[in-house]
Amino acid sequence: DIEIDKLSEEEKEFCKQALLNYKSFQNIIWHGDMYRLQDPYENPIASIQYVNHEKTSSVVFSFLVSQRFQTFYSKEPILFKGLDQKKIYKIEEVNLFRGEITEIDQEATYTGEYLMKFGFNPIVSDKRKSVVLKINEITL
């Protein structure tokens, strides 16, 4: 639970931005298809993906559910689901704390086939306990 009265101004700004981010992809969550990508009972990380029906936009939530005995968690890529194999996508990390720099190459592009066959590593770790990725189709 978040105790708002105990948050710093910077933390309050982060919460406001997180709500704006959520609003930008809430229709994908409410009306899209949901895929469980990683089982938290078998992995220290849980990952859930939502994809809109047109397969043009997606959002992936990956978060640490267990910290036992490990300092780096997502060594293996996560195989995405529900994308169009032929479409080309760009991945953007959202919900970064002010001043934090993503470890993800946000300029790279991937085919849906690549993301579903070979996957993508969101780089979840003890320092990055939660990663939110927006995946959008691009036209070249």
Each model region followed by its residue ranges:
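Active-site-proximal substrate-binding groove within the catalytic cores of carbohydrate-active enzymes
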Residues: 1-100
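C-terminal beta-sandwich/jelly-roll accessory domains of carbohydrate-active enzymes
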Residues: 66-140
